[in-house]
């Protein structure tokens, strides 16, 4: 630490006032950009929350359908929503279980018999063609289309006496 402190002091003493001012204003520009990015990020989250709340108001049977992927967890985890369906960024559609705000566990997970299984096994066990993946922790599935994702969520609801 002593050596680096001395080096810094030498640089400060050896640099001109103009160099120090230039460095300061460069730092101000970087700090300004960071702050602007943080503000824009917060505004984007607020806009997403509004879209998520609108989708929740239009939901049925605890299944919320989003028009695109949006950060939805903050807006839904204290509601009675059970599933969120949205277009996957990788193609097809995804369905996720909403977690309980106290336990942080899925309110209604996908079946154990689907968990981590290959597509053929999931399709055979579910009777639904087009479910391509179920996470081993049972909180997420992927499907070929929105209708298949909806059907999978409805099947879970029905099998648990919720439909």
What are these model-predicted stretches?
Residues 1-12:
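Single conserved hydrophobic/aromatic residue that forms the stacking wall/gate
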Residues 10-12, 16, 49:
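Serine/threonine-rich low-complexity intrinsically disordered regions
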Residues 16-19, 23, 40, 117-118, ...:
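Alpha-helix capping and helix-coil boundary motifs
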Residues 24-76:
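Active-site rim beta-loop-alpha module in soluble metabolic enzymes
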Residues 1, 49, 80:
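Sparse, context-dependent recognition of short Cys/His-centered cofactor- or disulfide-binding micro-motifs
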Residues 18, 35-39, 136:
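A near-ubiquitous, low-amplitude feature marking generic local secondary-structure context
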Residues 53-163:
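Gly/His-enriched, cation/cofactor- and phosphate-binding structural elements
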Residues 15-18, 22-30, 159-163:
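Charged phosphate-binding loop/patch that engages nucleotide di/tri-phosphates or the phosphate backbone
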């Amino acid at each position: 630490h002593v050596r680096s402190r001395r080096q810094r002091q030498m640089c400060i003493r050896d640099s001109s006032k103009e160099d120090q001012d230039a460095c300061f204003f460069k730092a101000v520009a970087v700090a300004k950009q960071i702050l602007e990015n943080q503000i824009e990020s917060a505004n984007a989250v607020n806009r997403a929350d509004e879209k998520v709340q609108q989708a929740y108001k239009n939901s049925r049977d605890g299944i919320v359908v989003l028009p695109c992927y949006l950060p939805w967890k903050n807006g839904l985890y204290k509601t009675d929503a059970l599933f969120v369906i949205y277009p996957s960024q990788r193609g097809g559609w995804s369905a996720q279980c909403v977690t309980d705000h106290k336990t942080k566990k899925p309110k209604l997970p996908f079946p154990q018999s689907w968990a981590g299984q290959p597509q053929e096994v999931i399709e055979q066990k579910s009777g639904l063609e087009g479910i391509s993946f179920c996470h081993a922790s049972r909180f997420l599935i992927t499907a070929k289309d929105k209708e298949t994702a909806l059907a999978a969520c409805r099947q879970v609801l029905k099998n648990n006496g919720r439909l």
